[in-house]
Amino acid sequence: MQLNGSKTERNLLSTFAGESRARNKYTFYAEKAENEGYEYIASIFEATANNEKAHAREVFNRFLKMNKNTADNLKDSAEGEAHESNNLYKQFEKEARAEGFTEIANFYKELQEVEGNHEMRFMKIYENLEAGMIFKKNTDVKWQCMNCGYIHIGKEAPAFCPLCKFPRAYFKIYCEDYK
């Protein structure tokens, strides 16, 4: 049987969208309950949000098989962000402005810029991945272990953190964003 193009595929896509939407909604409800002083209720919303995430993951990975490899996922993400930035939110801005919803139109205008930045970030990471430059640079840089904070200076991240022994996968370029 061919899933592609079937009603079942459409149902799975709808299920994924619904479970994803419910997860976010319950997360936001949890934040509200927490802000209002209801920790127990917040924990129920969070637990349910995690259940919804598990449901969405099953549909996404097991049935739709949409979670490929990291390189393909980066390209797919860049394409999605480009679509939102260049098409979808431009249209939404135009429609909101035409209907007189200036604040909402301005929101979509700003959102286009953010989504465009997301596209560029995903593409740059994709290019670095394809070039073998995720854990390697042409000059010495500071690499930071995301587990323990250890800083290594060199052209490559170490194979393992000398402090906590976590693997290279936990290293990123150190960014001093507090200056």
Residue ranges, per PLM feature:
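Non-heme di-metal
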Residues: 1-179
